[in-house]
Amino acid sequence: MILTLDPQVAGASGDMVLGALIAVGADPNRLEEVVHEVSSLGHEVDVHVHEIQKRGIRAVRVEVDAEGDLRDPDELREAVKTVAENVLEDRWRELPELALKYLLRAEERVHGDLCHLHELGSSDTVVDLVGTAALLEDLNPKASEVLPPNVGSGTVETEHGRLPVPAPAVVEVLSEWDVGIVREGEGELLTPTGAALLRTIDELLPDPPPPYRVKRQGFGAGTKDLPDRPNVLRALICEPGGSGEHVRIVETSVDDVDGEAVGELIEAVLQLEGVHDVEVLHGFGKKGRPRFVIRVVTEDRPGIEREVFRELFRWTGTLGARVYRCTRVTADRRIVDVDGIRVKVSRFEDVHHAKPEWEDVRRKVDRESAPLTRARLVGDLRKRYEGDGEDGAGD
């Protein structure tokens, strides 16, 4: 699954990100879990999720009501860390902590110190950051794309007086992030929290491989009613299009490991989330020694190479591995059931193939004592689904 966030029309805020993720299918109960954990720390927080219209666009509005301040940076860090540890799996805990890092760094650069928070300082910040990670964990996208955000224009009234848009804290969050901006509409459209969440999502999830297909869309609503546009953040759920996918390859060579250890290694690596395949090649290394080249193909996810190398080192003692990113071409595929036999039907451009599961064929022939041989049955199934793509090979 690929997640695209489109803040080009009306920018983004923390509550708009939450609403957009719920609108495309994230379970709002995950947000309730976050609110419960924040409340258990002694902060009164409540959340309301409902559907509204923004200039004719149906959108999800998330309202977070929070009482009490978190003006101390260390207290805010500890609250985010504690809530994240209680509701998130390890993989997603980095997101709220990194987003908070960008926010606190922006505060420090703008105001000169971090003794007292100015732009932040409420428990709803914890809900925005950890809640976004919880909803993403529920959706579980493998890649993301964040389009250039609309920052707005003009000036905005703050506790420090009237400031230009984008506000200084927003500019600091956007700095060093390789993204363009849009400047349309009056007023502040991109908040510091919205900017931090967009940046963190963009940086932590890999870019999607082109091409891809849009499956559904949803909108998260902002608070204000804008005079010239719907105040919404759009989210898109997409799927790879079938002709280009990025993968990572982790590869090492060993000449002092026996075949039994390699077999155990293969089994261990295939248990890791995101590993597609493991190949073992035979070759010759230094001084003519026989060696194994172990090649692991994984999804394109930052950090997965460390997970794979941990197992390579555990089972072989290898001192290093080569890691490279490449594109693989894949065919569209689906599984159909034909009289109890699973058939993998694949298509690339105008070429079709069908491959029955051999174990299903064997069981059917053995069980029914059919006069039809296994080879004949396989041939009949392939003939049905190959050729010109009729009888189910097409969409």
Swiss-Prot record:
It comes from the Archaea. Keywords: Nickel. GO terms for molecular function: lyase activity; nickel cation binding. Belongs to the LarC family. This is Putative nickel insertion protein. It comes from Methanopyrus kandleri (strain AV19 / DSM 6324 / JCM 9639 / NBRC 100938). The lineage of its organism: Archaea, Methanobacteriati, Methanobacteriota, Methanomada group, Methanopyri.
